[in-house]
A protein has these predicted regions:
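Metal- or metallocofactor-binding catalytic centers and their adjacent structured scaffolds
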Residues: 1-78, 87, 133
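Residues on a specific face of well-ordered alpha-helices
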Residues: 23, 62, 66, 70, ...
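Flexible, glycine/charged-enriched surface loops at secondary-structure junctions
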Residues: 35-40, 58, 80-83, 144-161, ...
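Structured core elements
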Residues: 55, 63, 102, 120, ...
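Active-site pocket-lining segments that scaffold enzyme catalytic pockets across diverse folds
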Residues: 64, 171-188, 194
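Conserved short loop/turn motifs at secondary-structure junctions
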Residues: 158-173
Length: 198
């Protein structure tokens, strides 16, 4: 939910969303005992009452949901990732967290004509978060080399991934994936083993 007031942050301000948090959301949840993350999220969705979260704003609802989740983790003296794993997938606690790294942008956050919003790499084959982060960063830098080699722009989109214009390619969406595959291989990793795409 954005304010739409062009005199503040060119219309991208979020005082309406903040007002929803401090107003109707706060009024509804103050003093409540809420048993689970699912119950809290359902309460927020019902309070908004729209399929696309347009009343309160996805930014307000997500912020509240995340705050509830963090508070629940802190009350149990657990790291956030471990708490989320216990809620949703207790069997995979040993391999979390695995970052999803946005390395190629399209959609509304890039002016390159790609329909997909984000092309991500998932270094799920890494033995630790530290190694996963390193793998993702190396792939990102290799992707810059791949794009430069094709004489494509290496500026980044709003979400931090590269956002070159691929209109000269017959199938620009497949080409975006092909560039990512080249970067993964150039970095020395194997798709489907070390790295997955999302």
């Amino acid at each position: 939910l954005r304010d739409g007031d062009r005199s503040r942050y060119l219309g991208k301000g979020v005082t309406k969303a903040v007002g929803a948090v401090n107003g109707p959301i706060a009024s509804r949840i103050q003093g409540m005992t809420i048993g689970s993350q699912l119950e809290f999220d359902e309460l927020l969705l019902n309070l908004d009452g729209t399929p696309n979260k347009s009343t309160m704003g996805a930014n307000a609802l997500l912020g509240c949901s995340m705050a509830f989740c963090r508070a629940a983790a802190q009350s149990r003296k657990l790291p956030l990732y471990r708490w989320i794993a216990e809620i949703y997938q207790p069997a995979v606690i040993g391999i979390l967290p695995v970052p999803l790294m946005n390395i190629f942008n399209g959609g509304a956050h890039a002016l390159n004509g790609l329909d997909f919003q984000e092309f991500m790499v998932v270094p799920a084959g890494a033995p630790s978060f530290r190694e996963a982060l390193r793998m993702g960063a190396e792939i990102f830098h290799h992707l810059k080399v791949v794009l430069s080699g094709e004489h494509l722009a290496t500026t980044v989109g709003d979400e931090g991934g590269f956002a070159p214009n691929l209109d000269d390619y017959e199938n620009k969406h497949e080409q975006a994936f092909e560039f990512i595959v080249q970067a993964v291989e150039s970095a020395g990793y194997k798709l489907g083993k070390d790295i997955f795409l999302a």
